[in-house]
Amino acid sequence: CFGIGATLGPLIMTAILQASSSWRWGYGVASVTMGLVAFIFILTQSRWSGSNKVAPQTSSREGRATRGLDTLTLPVVWMSLLLFFLYTGAESTAGQWAYSLFTEGRSVPESRASFWMSIYWGGLTVGRVLLGAVVDRLNVSSLLRMCILATIIGSALIWWHPTNTLSFLGLALMGIAEGPIFPSLISDTPRRVCAGQVDTTIGFQVAAASLGAAALSSLAGVLAERVSLEILGPFLVVCTALMFTLHETVVRHAEGV
């Protein structure tokens, strides 16, 4: 659902800008949509509340939570956190700054740039849908390896920029390749840590992912202001290359345990 909304957003905003002289209508449409979603949640709140409670598991989870910080003493956990930090940082940076790079840095028409941003987010959605079709046929580590390598190639095409079309295709490749990475990394957590630390590790990983999305996209913006928007390409290449290095290190550690 996230990917679908992110795909439709640029298309809706482009259509509104072409039909109206004010960008405020776009935010108005978004506000009304979010209000309707909130209203629907309120109306159906009783259906979302489960009546079944599992008391024994609750106490067990609380016991593990008191030892949650012990998880941070494991080097493999810190490597996993950095891996999530880099992944969401690269995803967010490409999603937030590629449009500015294309329109302001490379004089691409706004409508065309918006179309390819929708392709990027749509590719991420398609990638996650395809994950369900291939996950049983491929080893998770092999799938992650291929996807991360594809993100490196995609970001390299954005940096290289022989033509606008190849840059657009690089962005699309990044979107499709990024789709399976987050859910695959989450599902592979039990292989990296022992059973009693899985829940806590996943929580830390999601927190690191949120931090990465905010921090790295902000850093990219600062660099773009001080250097140029063209810094986006090498920035993404560095992030994705570090992702690959970390993933291979984590895999070797897991196989050695």
Regions from the PLM with identified roles:
Residues 180-194:
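Intracellular juxtamembrane helix-capping segments at the cytosolic ends
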